[in-house]
């Protein structure tokens, strides 16, 4: 028997999905990649991470759990799970150079489709790597990474895999939420791999506290950090 609570939950998920799809498809072209920039910005009021280093897309196939895990666990370039790139850094993948770009957005999400399109790169059946640095003035225990993506994605914090969502999906705010973790004092590395099938692709991410409210009080630092 379907309960009112189940109907209410399903309706809420549907509304959020429609909101995410509309936000992705209705706005104009995304901002051009920022090059050679050192950025250290306060969070927006909802706590979304808006400043990222994104690698030009890599061709892959598959959105199921096993296909995504196989794709993200393959080594495309040295130290891909520990590398802290700078804007303009290059890596070699299958004998071709790919470049990291510093990108920022005024929205809650980062549009990966426009990122790739503006660079003249493939937008479908591709893998995006993205990295950002969360700079905490003090240790923050009990935080949870809350993410959304179109389509599948896997996320790491300080080298530990913390959340993954799979299959073809629209971006929904807080679609996947990690277990509680501790953000250490100083620099914390947030890394994600996103696989897109044909169509729009984007991500959103923020940290939530025990009351499901955005964690604030830190900055996002894409500056000249140590490797």
Where are these regions (language model features)?
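Bacterial N-terminal signal peptides that target proteins for export
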Residues: 2-11
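C-terminal motif of bacterial Sec signal peptides marking the signal peptidase cleavage site
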Residues: 22-23
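Accessory carbohydrate-binding/adhesion or oligomerization-edge regions at the termini
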Residues: 26-110, 192-227
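Short structured motifs
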Residues: 115-118, 129-131, 174-178
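Short beta-strands within extracellular/lumenal beta-sheet-rich domains
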Residues: 124-134
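Non-cytosolic beta-sheet module surface loops
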Residues: 136, 145-149, 194-196
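Aromatic-lined ligand-binding clefts that engage carbohydrates, nucleic acids, or primary amines
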Residues: 141-156, 190
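Beta-strand-rich ligand-recognition modules
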Residues: 157-206
């Amino acid at each position: 028997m379907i309960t009112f609570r189940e109907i209410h939950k399903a309706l809420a998920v549907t509304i959020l999905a429609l909101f995410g799809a509309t936000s992705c498809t209705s706005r104009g072209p995304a901002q051009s990649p920022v090059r050679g920039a050192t950025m250290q910005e306060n969070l927006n009021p909802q706590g979304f991470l808006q400043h990222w280093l994104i690698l030009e897309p890599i061709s892959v196939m598959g959105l199921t759990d096993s296909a995504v895990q196989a794709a993200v666990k393959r080594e495309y370039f040295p130290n891909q799970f520990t590398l802290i790139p700078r804007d303009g850094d290059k890596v070699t993948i299958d004998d071709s150079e790919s470049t990291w770009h510093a990108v920022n957005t005024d929205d809650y999400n980062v549009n990966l489709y426009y990122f790739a399109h503006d660079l003249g790169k493939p937008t479908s059946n591709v893998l995006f790597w993205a990295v950002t640095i969360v700079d905490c003035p003090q240790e923050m225990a009990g935080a949870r990474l809350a993410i959304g993506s179109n389509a599948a994605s896997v996320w790491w914090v300080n080298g530990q895999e913390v959340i993954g969502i799979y299959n073809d999906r629209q971006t929904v705010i807080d679609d996947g939420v990690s277990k509680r973790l501790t953000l250490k004092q100083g620099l914390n590395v947030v890394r994600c791999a996103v696989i897109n099938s044909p169509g729009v692709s984007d991500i959103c991410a923020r940290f939530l506290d025990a009351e499901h409210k955005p964690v604030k009080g830190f900055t996002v630092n894409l500056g000249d950090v140590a490797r």
